UniProtKB/Swiss-Prot annotation:
Protein name: Conotoxin Cl6d
Keyword Secreted: yes
Organism, as annotated: Californiconus californicus
Stretch forming the signal peptide: none
Keyword Metal-binding: no
Superkingdom of source: Eukaryota
Entry's Gene Ontology cellular component terms: extracellular region
Keywords: Disulfide bond, Hydroxylation, Knottin, Neurotoxin, Secreted, Toxin
Modified positions (4-hydroxyproline) in chain numbering: 14, 21
Amino acid sequence: GDACSLLNGDDCGPGELCCTPSGDHQGTCETSCW
């Protein structure tokens, strides 16, 4: 998905979550996190 950052708040679209598998602030927008 698109890049997102938890530091800037969740900049993902409706129904998308900012997934950060590495536990970092940087992640990607996905419909579900696993």
